[in-house]
Amino acid sequence: MINIRKTHPLMKIVNNAFIDLPTPPNISSWWNFGSLLGICLILQILTGLFLAMHYTSDTMTAFSSVTHICRDVNYGWIIRYMHANGASMFFICLFMHVGRGLYYGSYTFLKTWNIGVILLFATMATAFMGYVLPWGQMSSWGATVITNILSAIPYIGTNLVEWIWGGFSVDKATLTRFFAFHFILPFIISALAMVHLLFLHETGSNNPTGISSDADKIPFHPYYTIKDILGALLLILALMLLVLFAPDLLGDPDNYTPANPLNTPPHIKPEWYFLFAYAILRSIPNKLGGVLALIFSILILVLMPALHTSKQRSMMFRPISQCIFWILVADLLTLTWIGGQPVEHPYIIIGQLASIMYFLLILVLMPMAGSIENNSLKW
């Protein structure tokens, strides 16, 4: 009798994706982050669902409802902090996952890569709207500043911003719609993640060498299921250390002050995972220019396949490209640091130099390095 997992219509899908999936035998721990992102997404949906049972999306009661969750709901505090810090873990995994894709040339799977970029945008939108919901000072002012960047769009900008706000300022209508979108988007992300996986399984996984591994595959289970479980345990360990010992480490103290439209916080800044993009936005004195740079700083990922000049797929055997890649990582860390600093000397000039460096590295130096490596190998 043939195994049910190979015949049942639903079990067959699971089997082909997680059990009998032919996988390269040499994929490293950098390939763990896909499954970790799946775990993060499930965790965020579950904790978010329980938070939504007690949260009220009204400007008068939103802040109090979050306080109520932490003080009066059984284990509400742990659910709230798992959700808040779970977002940070989500973005750490996301950045690692994208970085892995850049380093090992996984962007040559065009469909998978482009869906991934859409997923990144959707996740960033979800996280931004989630940050608005507790309705603290940074929530309200962050929403005001970030939605206001749309007013840079010529002719329709102001109307567009007021349409998104549902009035002439960030108020009850804005909070209610942000809650609605924050609730629905993770389910859209789940659907997109399935499409992402579908396209990946059309081609099979890449591997550190960048060479086709069709001649040598091993089943996903048990080899990579056990490896993913180890990754998941380490992820949960890191998350729980954060939640139980330093739950507010990555948050902003200003968000413990209820939103007050009459009092502007001294430094308006988003959560740490948006600081690199925020630094690029602030580095350009022109409003529209800053907004375009902000959007393009993420959208540049779509251009990666077109900017690939090397005849080798992976950076594993390309030392010049490796140097440029790690300089890019250092540059992004610099931008993240600058995004959290006040707009004053010397931070302004450092931010501007780091922003120029970011685009220069990706658009000019990486393609040049690929060509130099080709020539040095007489290819």
UniProtKB/Swiss-Prot annotation:
The membrane topology noted for this protein in its Swiss-Prot or TrEMBL record is: Multi-pass membrane protein
Q: Entry cofactor note text?
A: Binds 2 heme b groups non-covalently.
Residues bound to a ubiquinone are: 201
Q: Which UniProt keywords apply?
A: Electron transport, Heme, Iron, Membrane, Metal-binding, Mitochondrion, Mitochondrion inner membrane, Respiratory chain, Transmembrane, Transmembrane helix, Transport, Ubiquinone
* Reported cofactor(s): heme b
| Positions with a binding annotation for heme b b562 | 83, 182
- Pfam families documented for this protein: Cytochrom_B_C, Cytochrome_B
- Chief place of localization: mitochondrion
> Record keywords: Electron transport included?
yes
Q: Which residues bind heme b b566?
A: 97, 196
User: One of this protein's GO BP terms?
Assistant: mitochondrial electron transport, ubiquinol to cytochrome c
Q: Which InterPro entries match?
A: Cyt_b/b6_C (IPR005798), Cyt_b/b6_C_sf (IPR036150), Cyt_b/b6_N (IPR005797), Cytb/b6-like_sf (IPR027387), Cytochrome_b (IPR030689), Cytochrome_b_C_euk/bac (IPR048260), Cytochrome_b_N_euk/bac (IPR048259), Di-haem_cyt_TM (IPR016174)
Q: Which GO terms describe its molecular function?
A: metal ion binding; ubiquinol-cytochrome-c reductase activity
Question: Where found, per UniProt?
Answer: Mitochondrion inner membrane
Q: Which residues form the signal peptide?
A: none
The further comment given in this record reads: Heme 1 (or BL or b562) is low-potential and absorbs at about 562 nm, and heme 2 (or BH or b566) is high-potential and absorbs at about 566 nm.
The family annotation for this protein states: Belongs to the cytochrome b family.
> What is the protein's quaternary organization?
The cytochrome bc1 complex contains 11 subunits: 3 respiratory subunits (MT-CYB, CYC1 and UQCRFS1), 2 core proteins (UQCRC1 and UQCRC2) and 6 low-molecular weight proteins (UQCRH/QCR6, UQCRB/QCR7, UQCRQ/QCR8, UQCR10/QCR9, UQCR11/QCR10 and a cleavage product of UQCRFS1). This cytochrome bc1 complex then forms a dimer.
What name is this protein filed under?
Cytochrome b
- Its gene is MT-CYB
